[in-house]
Regions:
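Short, well-structured hydrophobic secondary-structure segments
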Residues: 1-18
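Catalytic core of non-heme Fe(II) oxygenases with the double-stranded beta-helix
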Residues: 14-92, 96-99, 105-110
Length: 114
């Protein structure tokens, strides 16, 4: 779990202003989990980055698990930002879990020719 966390921090810990791209929203959606709902293992490839905004998380809600190693148990108001190619899943939940998911793609910055 430590290696995934460290790699994700290195991957995301950059100053976007210094890079030659901007982030654009590729797509976004809401998901409303009730008792016994789950999400199978998946990634958000080809999106470059993904995020989950947790709107409602009951204490009995299932965590999100990345690459079978890193378990994140967010609370309402938490935002999780991660590489889009990182596999993750949500086990069967015992409580409500309402989220907004957003995928981002890198868009090259275009400089005007003067």
């Amino acid at each position: 779990a430590g290696k995934i966390k460290e790699a994700s921090i290195r991957y995301l810990n950059v100053d976007l202003k210094e890079l030659n791209f901007e982030l654009a929203v590729a797509d976004c959606w809401c998901a409303f989990y009730e008792k016994k709902n789950h999400a199978v293992a998946h990634s958000h490839f080809p999106s470059d980055f993904s995020s989950v905004i947790y709107l409602e998380m009951e204490s009995t809600s299932a965590p999100i698990i990345f690459s079978q190693q890193l378990l994140v148990k967010p609370t309402a108001g938490t935002v999780v930002f991660f590489p889009g190619l990182l596999s993750h899943h949500v086990p069967e939940t015992q409580g409500k879990r309402n989220i907004i998911a957003i995928n981002f793609i890198k868009v090259p910055k275009i400089k005007a020719l003067v």
